[in-house]
Swiss-Prot record:
GO terms for biological process: UMP salvage; uracil salvage. Allosterically activated by GTP. CDD domains: PRTases_typeI. GO terms for cellular component: cytoplasm. This is Uracil phosphoribosyltransferase. Its cofactor is Mg(2+). GO terms for molecular function: GTP binding; magnesium ion binding; uracil phosphoribosyltransferase activity. Catalyzes the conversion of uracil and 5-phospho-alpha-D-ribose 1-diphosphate (PRPP) to UMP and diphosphate. Its EC number is 2.4.2.9. Binds 1 Mg(2+) ion per subunit. The magnesium is bound as Mg-PRPP. Belongs to the UPRTase family. Uracil binds at residues 192, 197-199. Pathway: Pyrimidine metabolism; UMP biosynthesis via salvage pathway; UMP from uracil: step 1/1. It comes from Fusobacterium nucleatum subsp. nucleatum (strain ATCC 25586 / DSM 15643 / BCRC 10681 / CIP 101130 / JCM 8532 / KCTC 2640 / LMG 13131 / VPI 4355).
Length: 207
């Protein structure tokens, strides 16, 4: 598939706020949700529509409604920070959760929780995690979703490292990646640089 880096002046401006070490928890959380909302516009432009008829105050006319049923799946916990912004645009989406954390020594994903809609296999899944670093968590989550019968997945993140992009495309070339920024790389601890720090900690004020 492909990697789509979404370029937009509002996203650029809000990403600068997120990157700054001086941004407080409230502002970080708000801007993260706003970026997620802006990205959703681009990431959903290929949703399928079906024709219908609507009666306006003047006459009947042809109109369109969403044919695709959407499920939003954040990778816990940082993915939760993108949920509200996306739901603002797709309020009918069902929401599942996949809990994966990264072992800080091996940098490999460790699974701890999953709860998905019962009809997940029939839905277009938007998988979200703000950071695509090594790609381990995203690959694990997509593996799991496909095991549940999901065939239509897109992955959305705010910041992606080349290593994570390469790993995800190698394992799941059918899954498009939408990101606000492609950063330089990973440091010795597996963190994206220049990045924006530990996104989960900055969302929830835990560090």
């Amino acid at each position: 598939m492909s990697v789509i880096e979404i370029n937009h002046p509002l996203i650029e401006h809000k990403m600068t706020i997120l990157r700054s070490v001086d941004t407080d928890t409230k502002s970080f959380r708000e801007n993260l949700n706003e970026i997620a909302k802006l990205m959703t516009y681009e990431a959903t432009k290929n949703l399928k529509l079906e024709t219908t008829e609507v009666t306006t105050p003047l006459m009947k006319t042809q109109a369109y409604t969403l044919q695709d049923k959407v499920a939003l799946v954040p990778i816990l916990r940082a993915g939760l920070g993108m949920v509200d912004g996306i739901l603002d645009l797709i309020p009918t989406a069902k929401v599942g959760h996949i809990g994966v954390y990264r072992n800080e020594e091996t940098l490999e994903p460790v699974y701890y929780y999953c709860k998905l809609p019962t009809d997940i296999a029939s839905r277009k899944v938007i998988l979200v995690d703000p950071m695509l670093a090594t790609g381990g968590s995203a690959v694990y989550a997509i593996d799991y979703l496909k095991e549940q019968g999901v065939t239509d997945i897109i992955f959305m993140c705010l910041v992606a490292a080349p290593d994570g992009i390469a790993r995800l495309l190698n394992k799941h070339p059918d899954v498009p990646i939408y990101t606000a920024k492609i950063d330089q790389g990973l440091n010795e601890n597996g963190y994206i640089y220049p990045g924006l720090g530990d996104c989960g900690d900055r969302i929830f004020g835990t560090k």
